Amino acid sequence: MKLFLKKYGIPLLGATIMCLLLFFLRKIQNLDFNTKEIFIMVSIFSSTLLIRTVDDIIDYKEDIRNNKKTFKIHLSYILGSLLLLIGIIMNILSVQVISTLLFIIYVAYMTFAFYKKSRILKIFIYPILIVVNFTQLMFINNGLINYPISIVYISILTILTLSISIIFGIVKKG
């Protein structure tokens, strides 16, 4: 239990805050919650768990290079996988398969880019990615952007993130 809280506590707290903000925004606008908002909330939690799990997988790969055997399968991986699966199913029901796949690839790619370049950025990875992906989901759900534009949107954000990561990496090394 302590291991689960240590690894997932802060990211899940960030996701909870994001969901509460969404809830209060809906209440301020005097709008009722519908299935779309619930799907978005599940997506926020599942993407947070995906980010944390990818982070652990990268840690595991680095441990292999250092000849250390510290990787352990524990309850948080099983729980993370189940919640991720639920998030994917919910996303498919509310959005489309294409945007769901883009969403998953994007989260995994951004996580890798952040983690490999700077420890400073790693601290901010969870809230940044939750906000970015939440925004992307809102755009797609509201029909404000179509799939070709969403691909451009993801590409621009990825390039910007990589650029910031590289700059921080150079500053840190310098």
Which residues are covered by each model-predicted region?
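Multi-pass alpha-helical membrane architecture of UbiA-family
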Residues: 1-174
